[in-house]
Amino acid sequence: NEYKSFDFSLGFVFTPAEEYLDLEFRKKMKENNRITYLGGKPEAIKLGIFNEFDFAIAIHSMGGEPTRRSIELNCNLAGFLYKYYTFLGKPAHAGFAPQAGINAYSISTLFNTALGLFRQQIDEKYMVRINPVILDAPMGTNVIPDKIKIGTDIRAHSVEYMLELSERLDTIAQCSAKALGGDVKIETEMGYLPFLQSHYLSNFVRETFKNFPEIEYCKENSPVSAAGDIG
């Protein structure tokens, strides 16, 4: 009951667009000056929604089928940035004169292969995740593809290491394109920052839940490579 002697108020804030999805739609909103940032909480910060608050507690439910009621504390989240690599080649008839073309799809394949081999050099203490996917690939079986757009996130628990990896991936992309005589257009987009939880505040949460026998278990200090705009 100690909290009853404190002078405080409690507010609940619900923010949209936590997941970093529907990016083309959000970019159009940004171009039309409807938003400034692509994520919900950064936009809320810009709008001053959190100005009246001294600190925040984020609560996130998890999936799965737990065998007992539990909570989790001090689960750090990764941050991420987003990369776009548009590999440019030269079209040609795949049957009549394939030698006259430069295969952008082959360049992207070389990039993915090099990225897989580079994985051995990544420092795992930062819990890095990289997941390249094809975003745009206008292709036909009788034409050497001249344009492939790859998108990937770079997740890590360190902003500095994310930026270092970004430069390494740029080099891999540029060298892959150069090796086959093509070119690459590179775009970098910042996503969310890592979320490093306050162990000091978590102590109060832990002590509070000790008063609730319904909570049988408290999991702690299990960082993950997932990200969230709470960072």
How would you name each of these model-derived features?
Residues S106-G231:
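Metal-dependent amide/peptide-bond hydrolase catalytic core
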